[in-house]
Amino acid sequence: VLSPADKTNVKTAWGKVGAHAGDYGADALERMFLSFPTTKTYFPHFDLSHGSAQVKGHGKKVADALSNAVAHVDDMPNALSALSDLHAHKLRVDPVNFKLLSHCLLVTLAAHHPADFTPAVHASLDKFLASVSTVLTSKYR
């Protein structure tokens, strides 16, 4: 459960992402594909090369979903319900992949905002991304 301090940290950190959200989403996806090559199997139709328009497009979708989760941090199950259905029933993404992408998102945010990535912010973002992952995998059961 996110504390009030966690929610503040997440909103502040994500606010600094701003217009870079799509780029950071794509960066995190590229990191995931390079670090965890098995994740590429979910994107057989994508050009996975650096800077690919498809990776950038999906990175924007990831970032938009996270922006939605931040905006509805107190009601993520409803805010992410359609996305949870999509990943569970149509795409059938292995739930472990959400943890892998979450890790890569943390690395991306730390790389782009090192001065702001304090231990407290890191912990809050980690808890937030774990909550998002839990919501996205809730329809698997």
UniProtKB/Swiss-Prot annotation:
Highest taxon above the source species: Eukaryota
Modified-residue entries (N6-succinyllysine), positions: K7, K11, K16, K40
Cited PANTHER family: HEMOGLOBIN FAMILY MEMBER, HEMOGLOBIN SUBUNIT ALPHA
Similarity comment: Belongs to the globin family.
GO BP terms, alphabetized: hydrogen peroxide catabolic process
MF (Gene Ontology): haptoglobin binding; heme binding; iron ion binding; organic acid binding; oxygen binding; oxygen carrier activity; peroxidase activity
Name of the molecule in the record: Hemoglobin subunit alpha
Function as written in the Swiss-Prot or TrEMBL entry: Involved in oxygen transport from the lung to the various peripheral tissues.
Alphabetically ordered keywords of this record: Acetylation, Heme, Iron, Metal-binding, Oxygen transport, Phosphoprotein, Transport
GO cellular component terms, semicolon-separated: blood microparticle; haptoglobin-hemoglobin complex; hemoglobin complex
Chain residues that bind heme b: H87
Quaternary structure and partners: Heterotetramer of two alpha chains and two beta chains.
Positions carrying Phosphoserine: S3, S35, S49, S102, S124, S131, S138
Signal sequence annotation: none
Pfam families given in the database record: Globin
PROSITE patterns attached to this UniProt entry: GLOBIN
Positions carrying Phosphotyrosine: Y24
InterPro entries per UniProt: Globin (IPR000971), Globin-like_sf (IPR009050), Globin/Proto (IPR012292), Hemoglobin_a-typ (IPR002338), Hemoglobin_oxygen_transport (IPR050056), Hemoglobin_pi (IPR002339)
Residues modified to N6-acetyllysine: K16
Sequence ranges assigned to domain Globin in this UniProt record: 1-141
UniProt: O2 binding residues: H58
Keyword Metal-binding attached: yes
Tissue: Red blood cells.
Protein's organism: Cebus capucinus
Positions carrying Phosphothreonine: T8, T108, T134, T137
